[in-house]
Amino acid sequence: MSKQQAKKSSNNGRVVIIGVVVAIVVALIVAVLAGGDSSDDDTSSGDVAQNQPVLVDGAMLERLPDDGSDPAVGMAAPALTGASFDGSPMAVTPGDGKPYMLVFLAHWCPHCNAEVPRLIEWKESGAVPADLIVIGVSTGVASDRPNYPPSQWVVDKGWPWPVMADSVNMDAAAAYGLSGYPFFTIVGADGNVKVRVSGEVEVDALNEIVSEALAS
């Protein structure tokens, strides 16, 4: 082989190698962009989503008024079908013979942050009725506000009960007539709303509220 042919062959080899390297780099860039382009802006990392779809079955409750009687008391509570932050199925099925207490919380809300320790104290005191199903509902999620993401916030706060992640549109909160945070709704074993409360509640007051609600 002449020197000219050897040089030409060597140049061709370099061109092929460079072409392969460029193709690999392009493929990696495309893969990274594809992995980062998601229409679901509710996820923070991995398989954990800060919002989950919520299906509401039943009439939506009126918003809790600031004062006066609550128009929702005695009405059938809507059923909720949704999921936890990790996608595990969850459901609130009023009328199944079990009483529920739903606690709607927002990670950024100072009143919620003050209330969670009280609820933990309430549980640790042994005052929670054995048949009462307590479910937290994480709603009002905002990535630009304190304590985001809520999936980590509930862990850091030591929340001891299951948590349903509300939808981006806050379907669960709207269905129960949320008017502020934290927001409590107690549903009797008959499936009807017994009481709704908005704002912080001390442990002694909570005991009284729950006892009266479940006795009605």
PLM regions and their residue ranges:
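Short active-site neighborhood of thiol/selenol oxidoreductases, capturing the structured segment around
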Residues: 90-113, 119
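N-terminal targeting signals for export/organelle localization
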Residues: 1-76
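Thiol-based oxidoreductase modules, predominantly thioredoxin-like and allied folds used
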Residues: 129-147, 159-169
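Thiol-/selenol-based redox modules, centered on thioredoxin-like
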Residues: 180-216
